[in-house]
Each structure stands twice: as C-alpha cells, then as structure tokens.
C-alpha cells in the first residue's frame, strides 16, 4: 500500500463501479470496459487503480446477461461484489448502493467511479478522500474548463460565448457517505430529475459538494480512439 493520509487509512471506504452501460458512442456491439489495453481489460485497470486505496470492498454493477465480468482477474478479488445494473447509470449506482447498505454502514464513505476511466492517479484518489474526510463533505475530482465555450442554436450557429471563469469539468471518482448519496439519488429519481452524476443528485437535495483538482489525463474512454490514448497515458504513468 502506498503512503496514505492517516484519516484515509482509518476510514471505512467502499467503491461502486457502474459497468452495465452499452457505451453506444464507442460501439454498437462491443463494451468499452471489456476492451484490452496491453494484457488487461479497461475495467481491470480501473479496479487496480481504485485498489491502491484501502477499500473494504467494491461493487461492480453489471448487465444482467454479463457472464464475463466475474471471470476477470480483478485486484483484491476477494473484495469484489457484483450486482445487477440498471437502465441508466444512475439506476446502476442506486442498485449498488442498495447492495452496499446490506453490508456497510450508512456513514461509511463510497467512491463512485466510471468503469471506463482507468488512468486516475493514486495522488488524485488520496487527495480526494482526504479532503472529503477532513471537511466531512462530499467531493468530486474536477478540472477547470480550459477551452472557450460556445452556446449554439439548433442550426449549429453560435449564439454567444459562455464565460468559463467559474466552470469546472466534472470527473470521477465522486465521494459521499453511503446514506446521503442513496437518499439523494432516490429523491432525485422520485422527482423525475435528470441525474448525470452523483454530484447532481447531491446538489438537488441541498448537499454541499466540493471540487478537488483532478488531472487532464484522467480521461473517460468514450470513442474507439480513446483506447490508444489511454494506453499511452498508462504507459507514461508507469
């Protein structure tokens, strides 16, 4: 185990990895989390990164017909749990939280991380968890928006330039206490709110969420070209 902040090593930490999505932008037939980078699948790389933290366990929310995930060589496989995913990412996360609530305390912390985000660094993970625990507040990794943003109309014509001064691009992991996050997602779904990440659910019930500086190389594999980029990033980080 690499050097951890004291609070991190003393806290019960869990992880949830929603991995039931079809990833239609990547391929109509192939799942991006099961593509190979070197000798391991994307999701194995992702779990390996998260396992640098002293996790009590992690839950993979997978498709109902998925028989492949359980055959993979996950890091600390004795800590792996599996549950059925849902129609959307938010439903997969909620299913995993419902699973966790049977084996964990509602005041335990949970990191929710994209299955197709295998390049997150230990330093970012450690800082995220430390900040959340020290402030007793939910947190996400994020980076300030760098590029100029344009708002366009339906004809793809620019209407105005959007100020990026206070805009951050959300990443994962996103960390919260299990009970609070579960309540936030349940409430948001009940109110038919559009939930794109955990922070948006937490915001909807008035929870404060802090941003912790991430890194631009914490990419999410979305398109086939991203696989090669992820391979190069992992190679350079190692």
UniProtKB/Swiss-Prot annotation:
The gene is ispD. Coiled coil: none annotated. This is 2-C-methyl-D-erythritol 4-phosphate cytidylyltransferase. One of its GO terms (molecular function) is 2-C-methyl-D-erythritol 4-phosphate cytidylyltransferase activity. Gene3D superfamilies: Spore Coat Polysaccharide Biosynthesis Protein SpsA, Chain A. The record marks 164, 220 as: Positions MEP for the nucleophilic attack. Its EC number is 2.7.7.60. It comes from Acinetobacter baumannii (strain SDF). CDD domains: CDP-ME_synthetase (cd02516). It catalyses: 2-C-methyl-D-erythritol 4-phosphate + CTP + H(+) = 4-CDP-2-C-methyl-D-erythritol + diphosphate. The keyword rRNA-binding does not apply. SUPFAM superfamilies: Nucleotide-diphospho-sugar transferases. Keywords: Isoprene biosynthesis, Nucleotidyltransferase, Transferase. GO terms for biological process: isopentenyl diphosphate biosynthetic process, methylerythritol 4-phosphate pathway. PROSITE patterns: ISPD. Belongs to the IspD/TarI cytidylyltransferase family. IspD subfamily. The record marks 25, 32 as: Transition state stabilizer.
């Amino acid at each position: 185990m690499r050097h951890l902040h004291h609070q991190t090593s003393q806290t019960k930490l869990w992880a949830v990895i929603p991995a039931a999505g079809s990833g239609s932008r990547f391929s109509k037939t192939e799942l991006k989390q099961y593509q190979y980078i070197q000798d391991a699948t994307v999701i194995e790389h992702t779990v390996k990164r998260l396992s640098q933290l002293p996790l009590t366990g992690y839950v993979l929310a997978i498709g109902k017909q998925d028989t492949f995930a359980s055959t993979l060589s996950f890091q600390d496989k004795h800590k792996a749990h599996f549950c059925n995913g849902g129609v959307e990412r938010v439903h997969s996360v909620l299913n995993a939280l419902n699973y966790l609530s049977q084996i964990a305390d509602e005041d335990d912390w949970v990191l929710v991380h994209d299955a197709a985000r295998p390049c997150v660094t230990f330093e970012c993970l450690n800082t995220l968890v430390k900040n959340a625990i020290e402030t007793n507040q939910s947190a996400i990794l994020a980076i300030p928006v760098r590029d100029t943003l344009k708002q366009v109309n339906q004809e793809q014509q620019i209407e105005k330039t959007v100020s990026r001064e206070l805009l951050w691009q959300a990443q994962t992991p996103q960390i919260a206490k299990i009970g609070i996050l579960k309540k936030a997602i349940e409430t948001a779904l009940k109110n038919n709110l559009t939930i794109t990440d955990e922070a948006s659910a937490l915001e909807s019930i008035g929870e404060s969420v802090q941003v912790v500086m991430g890194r631009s190389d914490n990419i999410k594999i979305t398109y086939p070209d991203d696989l090669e980029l992820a391979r190069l990033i992992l190679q350079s980080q190692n």
